[in-house]
Structures are given as structure tokens and as C-alpha cells.
Regions:
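Short linker/helix segments within small regulatory modules
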Residues: 1, 26-36
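Short cysteine-rich clusters marking metal-coordination/redox-active sites
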Residues: 4, 15-18, 39-42
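Short Cys/His-rich "knuckle" micro-motifs
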Residues: 14-16, 25-29, 49-50
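Terminal catalytic/cofactor-binding subdomain
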Residues: 40-141
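Aromatic/basic-lined ligand-recognition segments
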Residues: 71, 169-244
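Histidine-centered divalent-metal-coordination microenvironment in nucleic-acid enzymes
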Residues: 111-113, 145-162, 235-239
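Helical (often loop-to-helix) elements that flank the catalytic cores of nucleotide-handling enzymes
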Residues: 123-134, 160-191, 246-261, 298-306, ...
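Flexible helix-coil linker/hinge segments at domain or subdomain boundaries
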Residues: 145, 184-198, 262-292, 298
Length: 310
């Protein structure tokens, strides 16, 4: 039935996903999104999907004690963007509550990404069944490190860096300074090539002190595809790490990010400028991180034998 313009704009809308014309009374909305209308079919597909669209962002559920929360995005590839496979991983990760979800990622060939809700480091280490999730992904034929398409992205809550935006910005500028100052070591830690980082996690460029770094960033240098993505309102995102299905590597990566945050929050600008890599290493006590640093020949020249990355 043809509609006049007045009726169309006042009483009708279109499904955000498929474009179907809907009367306003028939439009459906997701619980965490009051802006985008859907037809009933598309709403159900999104609500009960094993693999959500790339834009899917549920209301965050926080696990463990804050304010320093870590959100993980782990990309896996090579065995299909298969809802059944995603469902098997969700069944493991979501025992006792929704802790992970899966999303489409256009940068992958035959896979998807596993995303966690925000969790404390302790929760990631002792409550999240990471070892079981990674083992199941391997059993189903997925790769991450070896796929050459995958990243391991770590979000940290902005609230962890200070009580207000100004305090947060100062501490985050020290994160960027640390990353730039120790770029060569972190490049080795990341297991990425410089070419990969130039594409997906580019440098900001080294400055002589953290405050210069902050001014540099304020001028608009940087985008989502930077080593530390600052474009999100509630988090900063480390994008430099290559994907992995190796449990120790994943845990060590979270521990390294945590250590960098410690340095940025608790050291002054002058202390951070004076901090050498060897001095930074000397304070590390976490066994998973120490083992990984030795595997990458970054820890006091003490290499160890290691299992292959997958």
C-alpha cells in the first residue's frame, strides 16, 4: 500500500538489518540498543546468533574486582565461520554466566573472533576456562598465530588510569611513551612483523617525554589502527599482539599489559624516562610471563625450549 510522506516519517521505520518496512508498533529493539529498529526475524537472529555481526556490542558485564578490567578479543581462523564451532566455544566459556561472545571479522578468511566481557586479571587467570577454550579451538582445526591473519587485542578500562579524564590522559600518555621507548622489545614480544604492525597497529612516533607524547596525540595523530587505540570512550586497546592458541602466551600477554599499566600509573615521568628494559624485567615475578619472555629471548639472556605457537 502506498504511503504518503507524512505517514511514512511519523508512523513507519525500516529494519536496520534487512531494510523491511515496519510500522513503529511492530519494530523490535535489542535490550542494549534503543536506537536501531529490527524486524522480528532479524531481531531473533541477532539475539540468538552464535556469531554476531562485527558491530555487535552488548552491555558489558564486569567480572572480578575493578577498576582495572581487561577485555580480550582473540581472532581465530582457518576452520570456518561456523556457528556450530562458535557454539562449542560458547558452551565452555559461558558456563555459569555470559562471559564471552563471538563476532564476525572481515579481516579473517575462515574464522571469527572470541570476545570477553571486562574481567580483572585475576578472573582471567583463575576463573576463565581459557585453557579449555583454546584446546577446543585447536581440536576443531583453528589457527591463530600460524594463520597470519589474527590478532590478540587487549582492552583496559580507562577508569583504571585515574579518577577523572585529566588523570587518565596523563597516565595513558605514559603508556604510549613506554610502548614507543621499548618498541624493539615489544615488537619481539608481539610476535608480529614490522610490516604487520604498520598496517594494523602503527606507531605514534617516539617523543622525548610523556607530556610531549600527550600533546602529540592531542593534535590528532593516531587512529583505530594504532599500537594503542585511544578512540574508544571507556577503554584503551593494545593492538600490537599476534593471535595465539597457546595458553601460556595468552596469559603472559595479559600480564605484560598489566605490568605496563603499573609502570604508567605508579612511576613519575622522570622515573619512567630512566627505566631501562632490564630494570623493567627485574621486577617481573609472574611465572607465565617470565617463561614467555625467555622463549622470546627477552629475559636476561635465558632462552628456554618452547612449544610451537598455533
Amino acid at each position: 500500500v502506498p504511503l504518503c510522506a507524512t505517514c511514512y516519517y511519523e508512523d513507519y521505520t525500516r529494519c536496520t538489518r534487512c531494510g523491511e518496512l515496519l510500522h513503529n508498533d511492530s519494530a523490535c529493539y535489542l535490550s542494549d540498543d534503543d536506537d536501531d529498529p529490527y524486524c522480528p526475524d532479524c531481531r531473533d537472529q541477532l539475539l540468538y546468533a552464535e556469531i554476531h555481526s562485527y558491530s555487535y556490542k552488548p552491555r558489558p558485564i564486569f567480572y572480578g574486582d575493578g577498576p582495572r578490567y581487561f577485555g580480550v578479543e582473540l581472532e581465530i581462523d582457518n576452520a570456518g565461520e561456523d556457528p556450530d564451532s562458535a557454539g562449542k566455544l560458547l558452551a565452555i566459556g559461558n558456563r555459569g554466566g555470559e562471559r564471552i561472545y563471538c563476532k564476525h571479522d572481515g579481516s579473517l578468511d575462515e574464522g571469527f573472533e572470541i570476545v570477553t566481557h571486562p574481567m580483572s586479571l585475576d578472573f582471567h587467570l583463575h576463573e576463565m576456562p581459557w585453557a579449555e577454550i583454546l584446546e577446543k579451538a585447536i581440536q576443531m582445526g583453528y589457527l591463530s598465530h600460524k594463520a597470519n591473519t589474527c590478532g590478540l587485542h587487549v582492552h583496559i578500562s580507562r577508569a583504571a588510569f585515574g579518577a577523572n579524564r585529566g588523570e587518565q590522559d596523563f597516565a595513558i600518555s605514559r603508556v604510549l611513551y613506554f610502548v614507543e621507548k621499548h618498541w624493539n622489545e615489544l615488537l619481539r614480544f608481539s610476535r608480529r612483523t614490522q610490516r604487520q604492525l604498520d598496517r594494523w597497529a602503527a606507531r605514534y612516533g617516539y617523543k622525548d617525554d610523556p607530556q610531549e607524547m600527550q600533546e602529540h596525540v592531542k593534535k590528532g595523530y593516531g587512529s583505530r589502527y594504532t599500537c594503542v587505540n585511544l578512540t574508544n570512550d571507556a577503554t584503551i586497546e593494545f593492538r600490537i599482539f599476534r593471535g595465539t592458541l597457546k595458553y601460556n602466551t595468552l596469559i603472559a600477554t595479559l600480564q605484560m599489559v598489566n605490568r605496563i599499566c603499573d609502570a604508567a600509573i605508579f612511576l613519575s615521568d622522570e622515573q619512567l624516562k630512566a627505566l631501562s628494559w632490564s630494570e623493567f624485567m627485574a621486577g617481573i615475578r609472574e611465572p607465565e610471563l617470565i617463561r614467555y619472555l625467555k622463549e622470546q629471548r627477552l629475559y636476561l639472556n635465558e632462552p628456554v625450549e618452547s612449544e610451537a605457537e598455533l
